[in-house]
Amino acid sequence: MPRYKLVIEYDGGPFCGWQRQADDPTVQAAIETAVTRFSGETARLTCAGRTDAGVHAIHQVAHLDLARDWRTDTVRDALNAHLRPQPIAIVSAEVVTHDFDARHSAIRRHYRYRILNRRSPAALTRAHVWHVPWPLDADLMHAAAQRLLGRHDFSAFRAAECQAASPVRTLEQLDVTRQRMGLFEEIVIATSARSFLHHQVRAMAGTLMLAGCRRLSADDVAEILATKAKHRCGPLAPACGLTFVGVDYDEK
């Protein structure tokens, strides 16, 4: 029974997240249905990061076991054929050993949050950015972000319904940069950690936005973290601006 590793790209807009639900469309359910249609088998996918409703991915990783030994290009192409016209693409498929687990073998996950920072709304990218029309200072946002790096109790930045056993996480990267392409003004928040709490990235993005418009200082952000003052955080940034961009595995 071979195990296949899939690299997956999807637009999260039409889906109620990754994880299969009884009555709502999800990315997991769509791919598992495609697996059944091409192989005749019922397989359960395990992914690296269970994205929320509306969150996108350009390098999600999942694994599944199938009884038959299929060519990897057949797996990729057959799944893509059965997934049409849904906005999901299987970018690659490869056979891996059974000690590989897309979720538990991961040593680092990467997310990107995009803020369109100009007066005019987005026409082409509206489903992939958070439009903030007032001026933001990316340097102030970056300075505040550095106060969140390291191992901390991130209770202030977790969802009330978060099921993680511990709120302690080690944030390895949280960088904020401004990117300009003509009239396109975008602020990009890039972050990496072994794992994140439910809504952590979106909560941090909303709080950093307040730092960018000078409603919070870097010291304020550090104090919110230290005192777990969730009521002082910024708004929960909308899901559409968040993308799962990659996952690292130990090469051993």
Curated annotation (Swiss-Prot):
Pfam families per record: PseudoU_synth_1 (PF01416)
Catalytic-site annotation from UniProt: 52 (nucleophile)
Single GO molecular function: RNA binding
Binding site for substrate: 111
Family matches, as InterPro entries: PsdUridine_synth_cat_dom_sf, PsdUridine_synth_TruA, PsdUridine_synth_TruA_a/b_dom, PsdUridine_synth_TruA_C, TruA/RsuA/RluB/E/F_N
Catalyzed reaction equations: uridine(38/39/40) in tRNA = pseudouridine(38/39/40) in tRNA
Highest rank taxon of the organism: Bacteria
GO biological process, one term: tRNA pseudouridine synthesis
Presence of keyword NADP: no
Coiled-coil positions: none
Role: Formation of pseudouridine at positions 38, 39 and 40 in the anticodon stem and loop of transfer RNAs.
Subunit-level organization: Homodimer.
Family listed: Belongs to the tRNA pseudouridine synthase TruA family.
Name this polypeptide is given: tRNA pseudouridine synthase A
Species whose genome carries this gene: Methylorubrum populi (strain ATCC BAA-705 / NCIMB 13946 / BJ001) (Methylobacterium populi)
